[in-house]
């Protein structure tokens, strides 16, 4: 068989494979399979374990972790159009509006390669209008939310957790001085970079944040219960058990 005949045979085989893929509904590898994406909102009070579980979810599902606070700081630092608009509002003491936040999430979904296999939203939405605008944007992209998982834990337990929390700023990995210490004191296990304790990780600041959190979150939980995608998990358990429960919620 000549080289040209071999090429022709390979070409015909490739065409035949594509025909068979279409018959059984297999998408070409160049197209994202939206049906298999992780599309999740993670709900939880400060210290409930969202950061820890988001990192594990990101690694397991090769999805992107969209922490809106981090996104906002990144956009401002990079000087993007949305970041500049947000900075102008913040410099005047205002709150960044929903349109800018939705725009940042949409931009991240469209440009971040890690988001091709799904996303974990952390810290957003916080109000019913935000949830409605998020749903509208995601439905327009044909990537509606599949799950809203709430990490439930008593406020009293959160105080012990949060006051000993240590964070690796670049990745969001979190540790605890007592319950989950790093291998080397004040040092990230993966990168060897220093850990920090956030200035607002103290009891007085936490109690103020919890009042705001509960006022905002209860309506959001009810919203997602009505849509049928909400599930609650006991976050007072050990992280490994919480992780197993999350996987059960995701059908794993």
UniProtKB/Swiss-Prot annotation:
Q: Where is this region: LID?
A: 164-201
Gene Ontology cellular component annotations, sorted alphabetically: cytosol; mitochondrial intermembrane space
CDD domains, per the entry: ADK
Indicate which residues the UniProt annotation says bind AMP: 68, 73, 94-96, 123-126, 130, 198, 209
Q: Which PROSITE patterns match?
A: ADENYLATE_KINASE
Catalytic activity line of the entry: AMP + ATP = 2 ADP
One Pfam family hit: ADK_lid
Record-annotated residues binding ATP? Answer: 47-52, 165, 174-175, 237
Cite the record's note on assembly.
Monomer.
Give the protein name, as stated in the record: Adenylate kinase
Q: Which organism is it from?
A: Lodderomyces elongisporus (strain ATCC 11503 / CBS 2605 / JCM 1781 / NBRC 1676 / NRRL YB-4239) (Yeast)
């Amino acid at each position: 068989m000549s080289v040209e005949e071999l090429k022709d045979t390979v070409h015909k085989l490739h065409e035949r494979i594509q025909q068979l893929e279409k018959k059984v509904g297999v998408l070409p590898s160049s197209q994202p399979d939206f049906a298999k994406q992780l599309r999740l909102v993670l709900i939880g009070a400060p210290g409930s374990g969202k950061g820890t579980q988001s990192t594990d979810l990101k690694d397991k599902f090769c999805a992107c972790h969209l922490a809106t606070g981090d996104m906002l700081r990144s956009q401002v630092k990079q000087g993007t159009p949305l970041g500049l608009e947000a900075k102008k509002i913040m410099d005047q003491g205002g709150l960044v509006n929903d349109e800018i936040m939705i725009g940042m999430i949409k931009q991240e979904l469209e440009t971040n390669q890690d988001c091709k296999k799904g996303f974990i939203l952390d810290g957003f939405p916080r109000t019913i209008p935000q949830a409605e605008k998020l749903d509208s944007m995601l439905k327009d992209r044909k990537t509606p939310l599949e799950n809203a998982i709430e990490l439930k834990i008593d406020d009293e337990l959160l105080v012990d957790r949060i006051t000993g929390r240590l964070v690796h700023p670049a990745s969001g990995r979190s540790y605890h001085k007592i319950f989950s210490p790093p291998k080397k004191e004040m040092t990230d296990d993966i990168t060897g970079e220093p850990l920090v304790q956030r200035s607002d990780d103290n009891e007085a600041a936490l109690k103020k944040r919890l009042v705001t959190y509960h006022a905002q979150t209860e309506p959001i939980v009810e919203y997602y219960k009505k849509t049928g995608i909400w599930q609650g998990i006991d976050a007072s358990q050990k992280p490994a058990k919480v992780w197993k429960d999350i996987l059960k919620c995701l059908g794993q």
